[in-house]
Amino acid sequence: MHVYIVRHTSVVLDGNETCYGDMDIDVRPTFEEEASITRAALEGLSFDGVFSSPLQRARKLADFCGYGFATLDDRLKEMNFGDWEGQPWAEIIKDEPVDQFFARYIEGVPPGGESLMMQYARVRDFFLEKRREGYKQILVFCHGGVINCARTITGEVRLVDAFASLPGFGSVTRLDFTHLED
């Protein structure tokens, strides 16, 4: 199964200043300009399935690119940072052991949230299910963390290294799940 996986365009919050994952935040005023580049990158491609995170930043891009009919799936949401969602990183660092969390981020769970391993498991479940259902080429609108989990599943990166480089906003990544084992 071949997958074209699209990261949403930039959002109104700065992820270097504010913690956001599965928080449903809006896109920036530059959305149409950014989304036009993504739409052009998808021109001429065909898919036997189109899926999207239900978060508005992914749904809006799917709609703009002509895929407003995409099937929404919660497994495609960004990592849930729980009580940290929407909080300034400066505050989290003051009140929470953030350095400890990032030192053990694969298994570490933010208060009320999920670990990277939990996110990885749900993302893997999604892609394995789609492959079992017989899809040959799908399009997915989602988030940087989901894309990095998918890259880990296909063996492109190790999970421990997955967040060293997030794909750019509005980028399209092509992955091959053909030889993936259940």
Model-derived regions: residue spans:
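Domain-level recognition of soluble alpha/beta enzyme cores
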Residues: 155-181
